[in-house]
Every structure is written in C-alpha cells, then in structure tokens.
Amino acid sequence: VVLTPGVLAKASNARGLGTEPERWFWFDPPFHRGQSVLLHKQCDDVWRIDFQLGRDADSELEKRPERVIPRIQAMLGPDLPFDLEWVSVYQFACRRIDKLRYGRVIFAGDSAHQVSPFGARGANTGVQDADNLAWKLKLVIDGVAGEALLDSYDAERAFAADDNLLNSTRATDFISPKSRVSLRYRNAVLQLASQEPFARPLINSGRLSTPTPYANSPLNTPDDAPFAGTMKPGTNCVDAPLRHQGRDTWLLDVLNALHGLAGGFTLLAFGPRPALESVADAGVSARVLHVGGDVEDAEGLLAQRYDGRSGTIYLIRPDQHVAARWRSFEAGKIRAALRRCIAVD
C-alpha cells in the first residue's frame, strides 16, 4: 500500500481520469503489466495506490523506496513530485472458522471470517454480525431466551459468511486470475466491455457488500399465504420513504427509533389498524407500526416493496430482518412466531 499526497490529482486529470476524485481500478495496465492497480482518494491530500504483486514477491524488498518509487513514476510520469507517506505489503485470505460459537465464546468480525478487501465485505459483515448477535445476547442475559437462540447466531451468520466468501473469491479470481481459463475469461470480458454494454456488469472488481437473507433460518415462520416480491422471511428489510410525525423519514429510521437493538419486535401493519397495539408472549413483545396511522406511505413505495395489500402484517426482528408475514392480523399466529423467533419452541 502506498500513500502519496501532493499534486497527484493534477496528474490524474492529465491522464484523462476526470475532475471528480473516485476509485479507479486498472487490469493489466501498461505501467504494471500482468497485475492490477487500485487508486483511492483519501483525506488530507493523500492518495492510496495498491499495486498487486506476484505470489512469490519478497515483502521486505518490495517495501523499499527504490522499488516503490519507480512503480509510481511509471504510472504517473517521471517528473511528478510526491512524498511517500506510508508503505506496506499486505496479504488477504478468504476463509472462516468452523463454528462461530463455542459455548460461552462467540466469534464475530475478522475473528470469525476473513475476506479480500474487494467489495467492502470485511467491516460490513462485522457490523452485521454485531446486529445479529446484540438482541439475542440481551434476551439470553435477561433470562428471556435460552442458549438455543445463540445457536441461531452461528446458523445465520455462518451462512452469511459463506455467501460473502463466495462473492469475495469470485472477485479475487477476476482481479487476480489463478488459471489460464480464468485469465482468458477476464480478458475477454474486459475487451467486450469496452464496446458492448451487456458485458460491463460482468467486470468484477468487488461486488459491494449487501446484507445476506437468512432464507433457511430456524427463526423464520414460513408463509401460509402467497406474496409477491422479495420480502420473504429471513430477508433484511428494504427501506422506503415515509412521513412520520409531520416529517419526511425512512422506514429503517423509524424502526431504529422504536426499538434499536434493545430486543423489541415490530408489527408492520397495512390497512385497518389492528385491534391490539402490541402482542406479547414468552417475555417478548411486538409493537404495532400502523401504515396510514403511525406513518404515512405518501409515495406508495412501502406497500409496493412489501406487497402490502390491506390487512397484511409483517413481524420484524430487532435487527430489521423479516421473521414472519401474514395476510391478516391473528394474535395466536403472531405469538407462535415470537416464540419461534426467540427459540423457545
């Protein structure tokens, strides 16, 4: 990793990169043949340049200024003044541990799984681990739920880790092909993408991290009625613009204001307001958020994204994943779903 400040922005513009600083990725550029290069604009007039090195590179040798400076000059020109702020060599791996929970020891973030830096999956998945674990751990500590709820952390987040590992490995193989077939595919995609729009989405410089739906989670209650769209049990809630207390806001902000990760569940209700304001069972409760009463779906996007025809109810977990959904408000079914969602059944 090389951090270089100064007039690099002018050099970037001179090379036809435009005036707006943004990330750039080069595959097999003329100034670094056979490898890739990544450019980031950072604060305080600092630029970060990542040069891919060969698998047999000597890390101590490659950190020496006499090795680094010629690479930068080949990229930006021999006459551009710059300072080396920091130089380092790093390696990455795509792997995870067998289990994320061993008794009273729970692993999260980089201690549980490691991915390549492409796609911002490292820090994001660590935050998602914490979101998943926080409300479960609170309910167990409070004596509301048993340790079986912590087992669901392993089931859900190990599944998410595998999904991230798959996507990270695919990106790594595109950026740094390990076989002739992969190299031929990568080069063909790049050549096509310069002329054919259909090929551009195939360029994989790191698909950006998105939350993983827990499709097979033991905490999900299966649908008992048909629904359109993607908001199945286990899926992270899609955001939508709303009006709340006279102000423009968003669904996820309202959910955060209601409960955060304190252990509360939400019943998102479309159509007439349910007779009950909340439903409780086994030490947990779900509070009604009525669309049309508590919040206003002024643009209709919430109903569209959730297939929210009149009478529809969604049970939403504290980490903003869908636990269950129904076409009518039935307290008995909601109580059963709550028990299932805290692993007491």
Model-predicted regions and their roles:
Residues V1-I203, R207, P211, L289:
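Core Rossmann-like FAD-binding/catalytic domain of the broad FAD-dependent monooxygenase superfamily
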Residues L139-D345:
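Helical substrate-recognition/capping region of FAD-dependent monooxygenase/halogenase enzymes
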